[in-house]
Design a protein with these regions (language model features):
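Asparagine-centered strand-capping/turn motif at beta-strand->loop junctions
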Residues: 96-99, 227-230
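A short hydrophobic beta-strand segment most commonly corresponding to one strand
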Residues: 86, 100-118, 218, 232-244
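Structural motif
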Residues: 60, 67-69, 76, 92, ...
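Short acidic-glycine-tyrosine-enriched beta hairpin
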Residues: 74-89, 206-222
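Conserved short histidine dyad/triad with adjacent acidic residue
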Residues: 21-28, 40-55, 153-160, 170-187
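Fold-core signature of tandem repeat domains
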Residues: 50, 85, 95, 156-159, ...
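A short, N-terminal "cap"/entry segment at the start of jelly-roll beta-barrel domains
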Residues: 1-36, 116-168
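Short, conserved beta-strand element in jelly-roll/cupin
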Residues: 41-45, 54-70, 108-110, 173-176, ...
Length: 244
């Protein structure tokens, strides 16, 4: 299996139709050579639903564009761009696009071959705006998440980490201003970088890749890279890696 980096365009042909109007594109998985990591996008047309299901691993869900409702055992959370929610192993959840516009999600699993079991929706709906210690899921709002500086002009915040209850994956969003460059040291595990908004030039050794919204690049373990924002507008990238 080829272990080189791999670029996937956000407008590539869908790999799977998970439900009517829901298209899945795999950025990396066991079938593409990734170890312990699957990252993909889900494009949801208005009015579409991913029915209730569970996974034998946790799942990290973040919003690249649009608005969706994520239901976790009946608890309904409305997520917008750069919001994220972690759903632990075995917890039933569903996603609906109740808006009038297409939504694009970014999903991550700590396995090369995620499985799911679909369930009946027998849950009473409770609208919530946040999570707390009484529920197993963990919601991160992009607007209010705690930021930390990677360089004076570059900030990031976590979606999935030990503090959010994530198991086997870690990552979040990094905001890179115009003309700035983020050096990313080599990791001992595989990772994936996806553009939420803006344009990026990613350099790995002597290779350069130009990415725009919803494009993604698989980065194998042991490879360092840098992300440059070549434009005069902001760049948001979601970086997720497997844990050791």
């Amino acid at each position: 299996m080829n272990r080189d980096e791999k670029l996937v365009r956000g407008d590539a042909d869908a790999d799977v139709q998970l439900a009517p109007g829901v298209e899945i594109r795999f950025f990396c998985s066991g079938s593409t050579g990734a170890n312990g990591l699957t990252v993909c996008s889900a494009t949801m047309a208005p009015g579409t639903v991913i029915p209730y299901h569970t996974h034998p691993t946790g799942e990290g869900i973040s919003v690249l564009k649009g608005t969706v409702s994520v239901f976790v055992e009946g608890r309904r959370y409305e997520l917008h761009s750069l919001d994220a929610i972690y759903v632990p192993t075995g917890i039933a959840h569903s996603v609906k696009n109740e808006s009038g516009s297409t939504a694009t999600l970014h999903t991550s699993f700590p396995t090369g071959s995620p499985d799911r079991e679909f369930l009946e929706d027998n849950f009473a709906v409770e609208n919530r705006s946040a999570t707390d210690a009484t529920v197993p899921e963990y919601l991160v709002r992009g607007a209010t998440a705690t930021r930390r500086s990677l360089k004076p002009e570059i900030v990031c915040w976590d979606f999935f980490c030990e503090q959010t209850g994530a198991v086997g994956i870690q990552g979040g969003n990094t905001a890179i201003p115009p003309a700035a460059t983020l050096p990313c040291p080599a990791l001992a595990t595989d990772s994936c970088i996806a553009v939420s908004s803006g344009n990026a030039v990613v350099t790995i050794q002597d290779q350069q890749y130009e990415l725009t919204a919803f494009d993604a690049l698989f980065v194998p373990s042991g490879a360092s890279y840098q992300v440059h924002n070549p434009r005069d507008s902001a760049l948001d990238v979601i970086r997720v890696s497997a844990c050791e």
